Regions:
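Conserved helicase ATPase core of P-loop NTP-dependent helicases/translocases
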Residues: 141, 300, 312-343
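A short beta-strand element within the Helicase C-terminal
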Residues: 338-341, 345-355
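Interdomain helical connector at the RecA1-RecA2 junction of SF1/SF2 helicase-like NTPases
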Residues: 191-286
Length: 355
């Protein structure tokens, strides 16, 4: 099967619409391939905001891939990546950044569920899915594919790629080259991302170029804190010295602090003051708050606190899978001031107006 990744010369180097880190990563990967080094797996480190999704669309060109498989860490990221390859979408990276001309765009297929149409896979030049879709033994489409079906595997948030599920996927397609993309090469458990880093774009350059927002912490300094004591759900006030001691020793205490009404109200009010300040400073009313919750009940508690202050707020959670699409559409349409999540909009999720 002929592939545009092999037949088309993309306009990348020197293209003003392609960002410096995107060009640099592509050139480093292409050079790695040209060098012919016997290294199957490599890594690219790009800070959030530098255009990692766009760089992923360029990577199959660097490898002159016949058919690539792209693995995202979750559904939200997979959907974003699929849009960058979708030639019916205004988000198509190749058209948006003048990388190549139609109609010879690579044919994408997005894999959802445990079954996939084999004819769609056979016709595709790139398949996009999330790691949960290929976990376990229930994925019929994966088991039926020959070992040489993909010649390139790309992991978004690739610092997870040392995990067992990722290793099993690499073993399924043993001849495929592997590229890991991440903003950090280090996992939470201390393991490093697999493969040598062939390109890394410094965070200070990303900030200077305006790809990454200047980050500023807002410190709240109460004299005392209240926490929820269980059982009974009564709130207890403690001194800061006691907070420090209990916080170092007791994980349940740390969770109780953030579920306290008084603590929640303090954080909500501070976040809204900062949101209003940024909106007034920039003249951009579409800026939003993203808040992380501990669990489903905490999601509801936070949303209700923002709504009580007259703000449009909602949440996404794995328990509300059908509702999540509606909430994400409201977020995209700027119909929310606040989005609350529990490990649902994690690493790699990008929305330009989350402040």
């Amino acid at each position: 099967m002929s592939s545009p990744f092999q037949d088309v010369a993309p306009r990348i180097t020197g293209n003003p619409k392609v960002r410096e880190p995107q060009q640099g990563a592509y050139e480093a990967l292409a050079q790695h391939v040209a060098d012919g080094a016997d290294i199957r797996e490599v890594s690219v480190v790009l800070p959030v905001g530098c255009g990692k999704s766009g760089t992923i669309t360029l990577t199959p060109f660097a490898y002159k891939s016949k058919r690539a498989l792209i693995i995202a860490p979750g559904v939200a990221i997979a959907t974003q990546l699929a849009a960058d390859f979708d030639f019916s979408s205004e988000k198509l990276f190749y058209a948006r950044c003048d990388v190549m001309d139609g109609p010879n765009y690579p044919e994408p297929v997005e894999i959802r569920g445990t079954d996939a149409n084999r004819s769609d896979l056979d016709a595709a030049h790139v398949a996009i899915t999330n790691i949960q879709q290929i976990s376990g033994d229930g994925n019929k489409w994966l088991r039926t594919l020959p070992a040489d079906f993909f010649d390139l595997i790309i992991f978004d948030e690739g610092h997870h790629s040392v995990a067992a599920t990722y290793e099993a996927l690499k073993a399924k397609f043993p001849a495929a080259s592997v590229v890991n993309f991440s903003a950090t090469p280090l996992r939470a458990d201390g393991q490093m991302m697999s493969g040598p880093v062939v390109y890394s774009y410094p965070i200070f350059k990303a900030i200077r170029a305006g790809y990454v927002k200047q980050l500023k912490a807002i410190q709240l300094n109460p004299k005392t804190l209240r926490y929820v004591r269980r059982p009974g759900d009564s709130e207890v006030e403690v001194s800061l010295d006691e907070v420090r001691r209990l916080g170092e020793e007791d994980a349940d205490f740390r969770r109780s602090i953030v579920t306290s009404e008084e603590t929640l109200n303090t954080i909500v009010d501070a976040s809204l003051r900062e949101l209003d300040r940024l909106r007034n400073l920039t003249g951009e009313p579409r800026l939003k708050v993203i808040a992380s919750a501990l669990n489903y009940e905490h999601c509801i508690q936070i949303v209700e606190a923002y709504r009580a202050r007259g703000r449009k707020a909602d949440f996404v959670h794995s328990r509300e899978s059908k509702k999540n699409d509606q909430v994400m559409q409201r977020l995209a349409n700027h119909q929310l001031d606040v989005i609350v999540q529990v490990r649902k909009l994690g690493e790699g999720f990008d929305h330009p107006f989350l402040s």
